[in-house]
Amino acid sequence: MVRKATKKTIKKVKQVEEFNDDDEIIEEIVEEIEEVVEQRDEVNDEFQEEEEELEDDDDDEDDEDEIVFTSIRTTATTTTPINQHNDKEKEKKKDKQEEYIDSDDDDDDDGDENYYLNNNNNNNNNINNNNNYNNNNYNNNNTPTEPIKTETIFYNPPIRKRNEINGTVNTVSGGKSSKNIIEKMGEQSWGDMYTPSKCLQISKQNCELQSKYYTEAQLERLSSEIRRNPSMASKSYHFLSLGLTTKINHQWIRALISMALLISLVAIIFYLPLPHLKHIIMSPTGPSIQTSKTTGEFDQFDFNNPSIATKLTAFKDNWRRFSIVGVSNFLCSNYNFNPIDYSDGGGDGGDGGNTSIPKEFSTVQELKNLKIFGSCILFGVILFVVWLFATRLAEKEIIIKSNLPLQFLHSILTLLVIPLLSMLFWSLVLLYFIQTLLIGNQVNGQEDIFYCVNHLSNSLSEISSFSPARELFLGSVGIVMRLVNYFYPLSIESLALHQSTLYDTKNVYQMKLVSFLWTIIVGSFIYHTFLISSYLYSIFHEYHPTTTTTTTTTINTTTNTTSNTSQQSNPLSKRLKSNQIDPSSFNLFSLDVKFLPSFIPEVLITQNFIIVFIWTIAASLLWIYGVPPNLHIHEGEIFFIFIALAPLIKSIYNLIIIEQKKDKINQVHNEISWKSEPEILELQRQRLEQDQLDQQQFDELIDN
């Protein structure tokens, strides 16, 4: 029917072109078009009835998808011929419209053409509206009508792909399939697709704990940064003001402990006697030591006798030879201090009394060298751990959480424990290299020991010709031997670890004790050599913040005066310059040098230079004048007293600096301190008023 109607319309249109004055033909065309529109309305009503029936069967989600899919297919099949026919009809009508537009007709004919065109446009609009209505009905059945909520930000919907062949829905990614959710959690449950919220509500107590932990973490981070860069602490006067009491207490504790060590060292040197010895022979093949049968040898000296110089020289030379023999026997013999002991009994130097050797080692010497190396590692690890613990205690002081027991423990570790462990570590390192290089695998037994002793004796004799090294070594030997002779007296042969006295297995533990003492003696020489070298090095490579800050401030002032001369008359700038804080006034690492003349360098008042200067004066006096012979004291022992003065000088120096700059730090801290909110607002208001007043005065000066 539709096709026949369109054919008739085409014929009628052609007739209209030939007979424009025939109104009856136009009326017939309009009636036929209205019949076509009525037929399309009937088809659309049938489609709407089918869709309403599909909406009633919407219980299951999967069934609904299939129904919608089939309905789309049915509508597509039914509407396609009509759409094709409508397209053809539109094209023909457009052609007719163009022909009407191109033709030159009368006014009456134009009116008829406009009537025809308006009717065609209305019909086209009706067709488009019907198509849009069908599409809207389909979309309304498949899309939610509610607006999108803000929580969709946290929603992770599944990507569902429709299988056009079977008409089923497959879940590609995101979430679970609808059947699993319905079985476990009920219909329309998509709770697993919501990510858990990060905004968790916590209690007030947990909030306080979190803020406390965060504060402690930031303080520890600050303490580590200050420990790596000590000058950072001088940039905060609040920080320095709060920590002044802690620093003063710590320095007093260190000063008291240093004073106690100094007094005990003086008592050992002046009140504990040395063991008597004479006729020290350097030959390793024969008896190397002869004991003194007479006591009070030095009491029989006549100091007015000119020949006393030879006897004093013999005294010094005997102790020099004794120290060389003792060190050689310690480094080359079988009785070496070793926590991982390689033998249980004495011997003649061949196998150390231990006959059972593991298969991995060909000789006892290999096992011995390995255990000495293990002892080096052991003491190195212990030293490192103790140093870390002492550093941690120093950080506690930096973050103002150090109490008196912690400060006392830190002082004991840094003044006693760490130096003693360093001595043991360096002595074992030297022992390992000597045992490995000079003795090796001990193929020839006793001959290798004599070879090692001979080489070491010659080397140490050459080193002892340098008087500072000789006196430093004799000082450590004299202090240790005084302690042993007073608390646990032994023979000279035992103290020198002479090989002929070691056959008795009953004296094994006694020899181990003496070996431990020689370990301290050798380590003390190495440790104090490094200590003196570090003080000498620090004089020329010490950081001087005062000089750098003064130079930078002078450069800044010169540049400001040259570039902005007009600001000199500004009272506001003058007031700001007068209130500027000099960073050198807060530096707790150097003295205030304002009292010094300009031609004197600041390095002369640093603590390291003062300590080295005292050591130099003491060594020069001891070298020139010596020690009175009636004291029976080595010059090296007196020099150790001045070495023990170094921690005390440091503590006194730091206390002087703090006392010198304490008032300035507290003054600035009180002027610009942490205040409550009303006080801060009042202070800001006062400053704003003062700035406005200064600006007015400055403007008046410019106008004048």
From Swiss-Prot:
Glycans are attached at residues 166, 354, 556, 560, 564. Residues 566-576 have a biased composition (Polar residues). The chain crosses the membrane at residues 255-275, 370-390, 414-434, 513-533, 609-629, 638-658. It comes from the Eukaryota. Residues 37-145, 550-576 are annotated as: Disordered. Keywords: Glycoprotein, Membrane, Transmembrane, Transmembrane helix. GO terms for cellular component: membrane. Residues 85-99 have a biased composition (Basic and acidic residues). The keyword tRNA-binding does not apply. It is found in: Membrane. Residues 43-67, 100-113 have a biased composition (Acidic residues). It is a multi-pass membrane protein. The keyword Iron does not apply. Residues 114-142, 550-565 have a biased composition (Low complexity). Its main location: membrane. PANTHER family: B BOX-TYPE DOMAIN-CONTAINING PROTEIN-RELATED (PTHR16148:SF23), NF-KAPPA-B-REPRESSING FACTOR-RELATED (PTHR16148). This is Transmembrane protein DDB_G0274347.
